[in-house]
């Protein structure tokens, strides 16, 4: 019988076997640039065929390989991180269900079957967010579930409206004006799943889940499901005249908000979550600029270094008694050299440093935005968000590497093989995946001829953001000023994600709670008590006391009673 902490190891080996079996067909399909479509006609309802459709195309196979490979590394990482957990078997099964739901979303282009994978992601994510069963996890799970249910309802509406076309196959959608509302609900569904504004507040809250789950969610499964859905529907959605403008505005707003919020956050996992939100906005912006293939390219490369970031953060958290506060970290280069090196590589890839994986995808998106004619305000905001990414990534790295060590003297900092081997594999992919994908992916990107100053603008902004972060950290107290903005209003505005956290959760319940509290004080605990139980008790007590006082056998009482009876008899006789 397997020991409990080996369950994740067995699942990790299973994922590696599946990845090895999928690798050769994926490379063949990508090389041939061909698609295999399998259809089974199950039955018909009012001349509408119910068909089970499976699509094996280069995009789906490549992304599925990415999901399986990252899952294998994260399950290997879980063997140490979740070693002391009593329910490791349940955790492993939930992670495998998560991977299964994502693959259903990838390979089934039928809207009804796709809904199974879509709902599966939402249900399993809710169970994993509340995994630790404390008040914080339960509150985070509630806002995660409710926000994702909005997307589920939108997808159900899309299924109902697609019935007008006589099928539910997303590969053959009719681009007509009457389908504008259908396009709108699909976009809203993708926005809720990928946490675009104004549905962004659930993403940092979902950090209440275990760190391996966060690594899987933010790299290649839950939050990328909305982006992948838009990529599947892109040919249909691009026919709607307002699609690109609306999506670009939402994406740029989300990227800017996430960058500003990450610059003032001190929770390690929330910083990485907000960086995920920023990169999701970059993918959406790429589709808003008309480059769905570049959005997919960035989604794959981002999955590699974001999984690496979470695994490195999980290693730090595991070594610091599960503390996520950056103020505990510092001077970890000598104690944890492999983890620190991998963290630096992941942050360089996130910033878009030359020849890292993020450089080939993110830099190309920014260059394309400068090359093609678009709204200059949106382009400048994208460039500003690129600088913010370098700012908070450098701040994160310096707080871990250069700040003084504030952890307890009895902390046991270790780097076991189960922690370092997934890091090294993901670190190698964070370096080579960008250049490798440019060789094998059919990106269909034309040669962009832009001036040298425009070409270097991204690199200059990355350098400027890193230098500004270094300047602020070295000229002030690193353990304090690097973690928050001193002005309280700006700090609250930034940490609450432009007030999205109170508006999306507390706003809807604050007024009912206030009214119900006043109702409780004014009715249940006031008038109803005075006129109800307490009032009846007081009246009955007084009447009882009067009656009991009249029954006391004293001569004066007898004299008074005799006088009263004599008076009554006299009155009656008269």
Swiss-Prot record:
GO cellular component labels: mitochondrial inner membrane
Transmembrane stretches, start-end: 10-30, 50-70, 87-107, 111-131, 141-161, 181-203, 211-231, 240-260, 280-300, 301-321, 340-360, 381-401, 423-443, 458-478, 489-509, 554-574
Keywords tagged on the record: Electron transport, Membrane, Mitochondrion, Mitochondrion inner membrane, NAD, Respiratory chain, Translocase, Transmembrane, Transmembrane helix, Transport, Ubiquinone
Keyword ATP-binding: no
UniProt cross-references to InterPro entries, sorted A to Z: NADH_DH_su5_C, ND/Mrp_TM, NU5C-like, Proton_antipo_N
Leading EC class: translocase
Pfam families cross-referenced by the UniProt entry: NADH5_C, Proton_antipo_M, Proton_antipo_N
Topological category with respect to the lipid bilayer: Multi-pass membrane protein
Compartment list: Mitochondrion inner membrane
Catalytic activity, EC: 7.1.1.2
Family that this chain belongs to: Belongs to the complex I subunit 5 family.
Task performed by this protein: Core subunit of the mitochondrial membrane respiratory chain NADH dehydrogenase (Complex I) that is believed to belong to the minimal assembly required for catalysis. Complex I functions in the transfer of electrons from NADH to the respiratory chain. The immediate electron acceptor for the enzyme is believed to be ubiquinone.
Protein name: NADH-ubiquinone oxidoreductase chain 5
């Amino acid at each position: 019988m397997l020991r409990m902490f080996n369950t994740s190891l067995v699942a990790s080996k299973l994922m590696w076997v599946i990845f090895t079996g999928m690798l050769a067909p994926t490379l063949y399909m990508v090389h041939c640039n061909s698609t295999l479509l399998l259809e089974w006609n199950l039955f018909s309802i009012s001349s509408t065929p119910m068909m089970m459709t499976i699509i094996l195309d280069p995009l789906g196979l490549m992304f599925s390989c990415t999901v399986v490979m990252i899952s294998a590394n994260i399950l290997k990482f879980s063997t140490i991180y979740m070693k002391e957990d009593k329910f490791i078997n349940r955790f492993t099964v939930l992670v495998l269900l998560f991977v299964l739901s994502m693959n259903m979303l990838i390979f089934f282009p039928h809207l009804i079957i796709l809904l199974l994978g879509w709902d599966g992601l939402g249900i399993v994510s809710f169970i994993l967010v509340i995994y630790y069963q404390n008040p914080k996890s339960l509150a985070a799970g509630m806002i995660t579930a409710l926000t994702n249910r909005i997307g589920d309802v939108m997808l159900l509406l899309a299924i109902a409206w697609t019935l007008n076309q006589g099928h539910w196959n997303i590969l053959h959608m009719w681009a007509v004006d009457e389908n504008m509302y259908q396009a709108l609900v699909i976009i809203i569904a993708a926005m809720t799943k990928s946490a675009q504004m104004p549905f962004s507040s659930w993403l940092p809250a979902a950090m209440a889940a275990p760190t391996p789950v966060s690594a899987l969610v933010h790299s290649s499964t839950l939050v990328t499901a909305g982006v992948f859905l838009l990529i599947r529907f892109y040919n249909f959605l691009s026919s709607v005249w307002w699609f690109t403008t609306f999506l670009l505005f939402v994406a740029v707003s989300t990227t800017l908000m996430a960058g500003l919020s990450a610059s003032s956050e001190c929770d390690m996992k929330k910083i990485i979550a907000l960086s995920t939100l920023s990169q999701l906005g970059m993918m959406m912006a790429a589709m808003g600029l008309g480059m769905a293939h570049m959005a997919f390219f960035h989604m794959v490369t981002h999955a590699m270094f974001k999984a690496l970031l979470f695994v490195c953060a999980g290693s730090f958290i595991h070594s610091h008694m599960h503390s996520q506060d950056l103020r505990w970290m510092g001077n970890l280069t000598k104690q944890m050299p492999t983890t620190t090196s991998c963290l630096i590589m992941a942050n360089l890839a996130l910033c878009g440093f030359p020849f890292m994986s993020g450089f080939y995808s993110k830099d190309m998106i920014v260059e394309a935005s400068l090359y093609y004619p678009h709204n200059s305000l949106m382009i400048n905001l994208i460039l500003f968000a690129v600088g913010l990414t370098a700012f908070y990534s450098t701040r994160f790295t310096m707080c871990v590497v250069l700040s003084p060590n504030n952890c307890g003297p009895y902390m046991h900092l270790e780097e076991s093989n189960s922690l370092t081997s997934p890091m090294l594999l993901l670190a190698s992919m964070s370096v080579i995946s960008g250049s490798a994908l440019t060789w094998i992916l059919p990106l269909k990107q034309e040669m962009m001829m832009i001036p040298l100053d425009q070409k270097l603008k991204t690199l200059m902004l990355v350098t400027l953001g890193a230098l500004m972060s270094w300047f602020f950290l070295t000229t002030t107290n690193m353990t304090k000023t690097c973690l928050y903005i001193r002005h309280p209003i700006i700090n609250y505005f930034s940490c609450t994600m432009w007030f999205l956290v109170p508006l999306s959760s507390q706003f809807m319940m604050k007024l009912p709670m206030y009214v119900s509290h006043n109702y409780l004080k004014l009715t249940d605990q006031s008038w109803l008590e005075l006129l109800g139980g307490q009032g009846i008790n007081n009246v009955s007590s007084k009447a009882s006391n009067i009656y009991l006082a009249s029954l006391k056998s004293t001569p004066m009482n007898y004299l008074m009673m005799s006088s009263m009876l004599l008076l009554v008899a006299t009155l009656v006789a008269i």
